[in-house]
């Protein structure tokens, strides 16, 4: 991973593969994933997909759009949401039926989920797809992929589980289920290669969506803040458990920062109404001035763009903060028993937790985990960013290089890889037909 930000960064005289910096464009064809020739197939391909979350629905829609450019008459069916339906996917079940979180909720819905999975795989097998694509949701998708692969259907898993962080041996088991794994991060394919699994780095769609140069002034105008304001964005998580563990600590840290920066504005985006209610309760018992605390409905990216510094939980949000080029402080806590078990068994294989730090193999953002995640230590780390603009400036080229590394037109690359798998399947069928005719 060392030096990842410098490898093929694609920023030369303000351009990337012919695209101007800050724009999102279609990448050039990938040499090792040749596009199929339209009309060369005997029939249009049938492609089945499952996306079990909103993020997967968006990924699925982008992939379908790119596959349709290659196969205009292709048929798409599966489990998805509004985004996939909007690009012509016939959804047999809605993605919301898979949207369960937490062990208790999963157990409560397990009989229904097992029944749905059984019904889907039987129906898709009868439909005879050329390929099945499971998008994220590994607990649901990998068993479906394995079952279909055993019956001769080509399978793809889009979005690798975090095999680089823990339980690396899962890579081999994933290979039993998927003919091809599409990875969002460059450190993932080498791990799969060690286990004999075909995995391709396609880039991260979020890196495609976010411009290289962010507009802080526009974000502040959207939120009614002046360009000269001092702003901290606070994101304790998007789940009830995370917010319960981190919210009070984060808001106490923000108050300590405000003691040094009296005109500080604090932006708190809430992922959903349930999170908003919990965050409102935590804010009400904090010492933060009401007039300078802004609880938002969603708008996490806008809050990050408007901020000078971001305080957030470890997770995908750290990647988003990196892509909008904001200095951050990362905190996280898990249940004490969970933490002891993980440490005792050595389940985690990484020394860093925040995605920017993992991608850079360097400490770009302070990480304060478990017992170190205290208001006082968070405050010290935050003030270090606020009071040293030279450090913030030095961070920008590092973030920009990582952004370029991930910005590969992910949907197009993923479609190229799927097209290659379809071509392999068709070649195999033609070879069998030729052998049969010769006999």
From Swiss-Prot:
Disulfide bonds: none annotated. Signal peptide: none annotated. The keyword Oxidoreductase does not apply. SUPFAM superfamilies: UDP-Glycosyltransferase/glycogen phosphorylase. GO terms for molecular function: lipid-A-disaccharide synthase activity; phospholipid binding. One of its GO terms (cellular component) is membrane. Pathway: Bacterial outer membrane biogenesis; LPS lipid A biosynthesis. One of its GO terms (biological process) is lipid A biosynthetic process. The keyword GTP-binding does not apply. Its EC number is 2.4.1.182. InterPro entries: Glyco_trans_19. Keywords: Glycosyltransferase, Lipid A biosynthesis, Lipid biosynthesis, Lipid metabolism, Transferase. It catalyses: a lipid X + a UDP-2-N,3-O-bis[(3R)-3-hydroxyacyl]-alpha-D-glucosamine = a lipid A disaccharide + UDP + H(+). NCBIfam families: lpxB. Belongs to the LpxB family. Condensation of UDP-2,3-diacylglucosamine and 2,3-diacylglucosamine-1-phosphate to form lipid A disaccharide, a precursor of lipid A, a phosphorylated glycolipid that anchors the lipopolysaccharide to the outer membrane of the cell. This is Lipid-A-disaccharide synthase. It comes from Xanthomonas axonopodis pv. citri (strain 306). The lineage of its organism: Bacteria, Pseudomonadati, Pseudomonadota, Gammaproteobacteria, Lysobacterales. The gene is lpxB.
């Amino acid at each position: 991973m060392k030096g990842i930000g410098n490898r093929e960064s694609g920023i030369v005289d303000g351009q990337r593969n012919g695209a101007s910096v800050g724009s999102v464009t279609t990448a050039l064809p990938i040499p090792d994933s040749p596009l199929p020739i339209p009309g060369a197939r005997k029939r249009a391909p049938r492609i089945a997909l499952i996306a079990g979350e909103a993020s997967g629905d968006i990924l699925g829609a982008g992939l379908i759009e790119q596959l349709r450019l290659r196969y205009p008459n292709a048929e798409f069916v599966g489990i998805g949401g509004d985004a996939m339906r909007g690009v012509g996917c016939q959804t047999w079940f809605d993605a919301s039926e898979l949207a369960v979180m937490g062990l208790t909720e999963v157990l409560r819905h397990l009989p229904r989920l097992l029944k749905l999975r059984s019904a889907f795989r039987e129906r898709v097998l009868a439909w005879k797809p050329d390929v099945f694509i499971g998008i994220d949701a590994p607990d649901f998708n990998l068993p479906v992929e394995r079952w279909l692969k055993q019956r001769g259907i080509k399978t793809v898993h889009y979005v690798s589980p975090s095999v680089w962080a823990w339980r690396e041996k899962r890579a081999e088991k994933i290979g039993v289920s998927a003919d091809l794994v599409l990875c969002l991060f460059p450190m993932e394919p080498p791990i799969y290669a060690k286990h004999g699994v075909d995995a391709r780095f396609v880039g991260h769609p979020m890196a495609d969506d976010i411009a290289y140069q962010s507009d802080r002034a526009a974000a502040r105008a959207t939120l009614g803040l002046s360009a000269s304001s001092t702003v901290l964005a606070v994101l304790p998580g998007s789940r009830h458990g995370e917010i319960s563990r981190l919210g009070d600590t984060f808001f106490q840290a923000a108050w300590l920062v405000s003691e040094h920066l009296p005109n500080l504005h604090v932006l708190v985006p809430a992922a959903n109404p349930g999170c908003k209610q919990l965050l409102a309760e935590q804010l009400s018992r904090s010492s933060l001035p009401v007039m300078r605390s802004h609880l938002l409905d969603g708008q996490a990216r806008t809050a990050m763009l408007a901020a000078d510094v971001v305080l957030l939980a470890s997770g995908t949000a750290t990647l988003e903060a990196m892509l909008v080029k904001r200095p951050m402080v990362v905190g996280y806590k898990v249940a004490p028993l969970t933490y002891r078990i993980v440490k005792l068994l050595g389940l985690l294989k990484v020394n860093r937790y925040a995605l920017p730090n993992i991608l850079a193999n360097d400490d770009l953002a302070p990480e304060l985990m478990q017992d170190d995640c205290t208001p006082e230590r968070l405050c010290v780390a935050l003030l270090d960013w606020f009071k040293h603009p030279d450090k913030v400036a030095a961070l920008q080229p590092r973030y920009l290089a990582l952004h370029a590394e991930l910005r590969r037109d992910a949907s197009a690359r993923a479609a190229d890889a799927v097209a290659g798998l379809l071509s392999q399947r068709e070649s195999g069928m033609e070879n069998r037909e030729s052998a049969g005719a010769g006999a």
